[in-house]
């Protein structure tokens, strides 16, 4: 909204001039007129309906009984605290003070929350798709499940808890300066594009764990071990993938939250940084303390964390490259 609203006025018109217009003429007039004055209740509702038919989402602010029809017709009915009781009952939003800046701030905050919700849905969907694809491939190649069902549920629960902070994340100005439609049309494209990248690094982790780390600690390849040693092998493997999945899902938020370069061109909110770092530390500690044993997790050697750090850095780098290509082709990310 402009601080000097008069400079945004294109033209104005009176209600008495609308009677002779056809529907097509009125549709054109509504698109090119900023102020209508001296309108009847039916004309107010008619203009709102025309704007809706033109593809707009329309809010209407009223305070008297003659605004009731327009309030019902609008997508968002707005009233003030001192308005008639019937109008307040019909309105979706009631202003507690006479200040239109409240509406502007509310709209902008709503758009920011909407963008952050879109971030969560897209990033979570792509991560889950990548994990599912990795599980399917691993189920064919491995003699055991790469992660138990309770571990998968715990991983998703912990990730969702961390993502509760996302509504307070910073949003790039170009993402909320204009209205955005709630649509899942590009969700599948985003998921299919970024999900398999996660799968590549999941499979890389599988290979590292199955062919080197687990045999080294357990004392041999899986098929050559006795039952007890095989259980140790499986626990190490599942813990390794649990950590890799958790680290990669959380840290990739920073890369996919904006089409800009993270921390340089687009800085996440401090609470988001704090919560994600604390979350990673706590969930990593969970694999060390006794409580982790109840869900089949165990302590991993330091050599694994060196590998984990390398994998996560490579994953973020590849996603950043893919993101640049994606934005260049589709002109958007979120």
Functional labels for PLM-detected ranges:
Residues 1-4:
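Short, exposed "boundary/linker" segments that immediately precede the start
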Residues 6-7, 296:
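Glycine-centered helix-boundary capping/hinge motifs
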Residues 7, 12-60, 74, 79-261:
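Membrane-embedded transport module
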Residues 66:
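Conserved Rossmann-like nucleotide-cofactor binding loop
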Residues 71:
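Cytosolic ligand/metal-binding cores
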Residues 214-216, 239-334:
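C-terminal transmembrane module of polytopic membrane proteins
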